[in-house]
Each structure stands twice: as structure tokens, then as C-alpha cells.
Amino acid sequence: MNRLYLKGCGTALVTPFTDDYKVDYKAYAASVDRQVESGVHFLVPLATTGETPTLSAREKTELLRITRERVGGMPLLAGCGTNSLDGTLANMELLEPFGPDAWLVVVPYYNKPTQEGQYRYFRAVAERSTLPIVIYNVPGRTGANMEASTAIRLAEDCPNIIGIKEASGRYDQVSELIRRAPEGFSVLSGDDDMTLALMATGGQGVISVASNVAPAEVSAMCDALLKDDLKTARTLHHRLFPLFKGCFAESNPVPVKAAMARLGLMTGKVRLPLSEATASTVELMNKIIDDLWKSA
């Protein structure tokens, strides 16, 4: 297995829906093209931002097929994690023929596994996977945090666990991960507003929600950080910060879809149990978008 090294800006792609809540594959393909043309470093279909729990098997495979077809050799990190080993392995079997380069596997949700349970689960997934794996730690959604020591243990024991998307919001934990991570293990921010801090202290990149809206700008910030150009990175961070915060004014991806609608790229429709952005969120995102382009 070739060692994949993820760095820079990876966009967690939204899934556009039509007014009658069907997947808008045309808008999705255009969105993927926009990402590629804007210089993002890798793409992440079928994750949280893509409303993947609401998608059918056919929709998932078609979205991944379209993505692979349009990105050439750009790395694709596809979401496949569930809260059971069998469910995650079944997703891998379903999706692998459609060209992912690696899997994004979330810490199992609802079950609230212990650190030992998390370790055994990810080790079992890694042993059965033919592709590299990136752990996704997002305790605000799963109810269980993966501690730095568990992630390091997995990185050392499982050669095909190549990184972690860290969305715990705990900089002390992420800093420990960065300090102890083995060479070639990517620590990626799962929170746009923490990207500057993480990359400035040795993290490799971000899996971004905001880059759906501003792919060139978020990619440029990551490029600057990879070159240790903190002055440029700080300027971009401060320009983008209202967008970073606004994207979480309501549950992701509700606000980012409102922003994409403002740009005319897709509708703001989301599938139940999510509901469309409130009037105040639409107003907020409209202002953020207008101000962002004014400040260019």
C-alpha cells in the first residue's frame, strides 16, 4: 500500500438538493469543478457536511463516482464510518469500486465507547481495509472523545491509519497529538477557526466546511501556513473568520448551504431531520458573503 500524506485544504463537500429534496447531481458536479479550479488539495465527499446519513446507497455511489471522474489524481477521502464494525465494513465494500483513495472513519457515535473500545474498533477496521484510514474525532456529534494517547497508539500500531481529523475543540489535546505523532501522520483540523493555530504549531491542514464557499481563499491560507508565511496566513484568517464562525450559526451544513444559495451555486435545501436556515441565519450568511467579497 502506497503511503498517502494528506496536507493543506480538504473540502468536506456539501450535497446539493433540488427543491423537492432530490440530489442535484448537476450542481454537485459544478461544485466539484469549482473546488478543483480553486486549488484545493484534496476532497472529502460523504462526510458530515454532505448529510451522508440521509443518503441512499445509490446516491452515495453516484456522488463518489462523479467526484472521482472530475478530479483526476486529486486525493479523495471518502466518509464511510458508522457506529458498528459491520456497518463500516459494508460501506467500504459498497464504495471502494468508485475510487476513494482513503477512508474517513468517525469515532462510533451513540455507543459512547471507552478508549479501549475505540482502539479495538479502529484496529479491526484497519486490519480489514485495503485503503488508508483517517480517524474523525468529533465528540460534539458522537458523544465520545478520542484522547491523544489513543490516537497515537493507533498511529503506531496500524500503519494504514495515516491521520486524524480533530474536531474536539481542545487545543491542548491537539497540541499533544502534533507533538507525539509519528512521521507521516497527518493531524488535520476539523474546525475552520482553529486551522491557523493548529498549522502554525505543526498540524498539516484542515478538512474545511468554509472552503465550500471560499475554496481559493482557504486553500491560500493553508498554502501560506505550509510555507511558514504567517503574515499572509494571519491576514487571510482574519478575513475569513466571520465565515468560519457563521458556518456554525446553526447545525452544519445548514448555514453553509444558505451561503451557497446566496452565491447561486445551489438551493439551501437540507433533508430532514435538518431544516432550512432561519431568516436570521440567511441574513447573517448573506452579509458575511457580501462583506467577504468586498474585502478582496
What are these regions (language model features)?
Residues 138, 167, 259:
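Short, well-ordered beta-to-alpha junction loops that form the rim of enzyme active sites
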Residues 23, 36, 197-296:
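Structured C-terminal cap/extension of enzyme domains
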Residues 9, 48-51, 80-82, 164, ...:
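Gly/Ser/Thr-rich helix-start
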Residues 2-143, 153:
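Active-site beta->alpha loop and helix N-cap motifs at the rims of alpha/beta catalytic domains
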Residues 137-138, 160-161, 271-272:
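Glycine-rich phosphate-binding "P-loop"
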Residues 28, 60, 64, 88, ...:
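A general structural signal for well-ordered alpha-helical segments in protein cores
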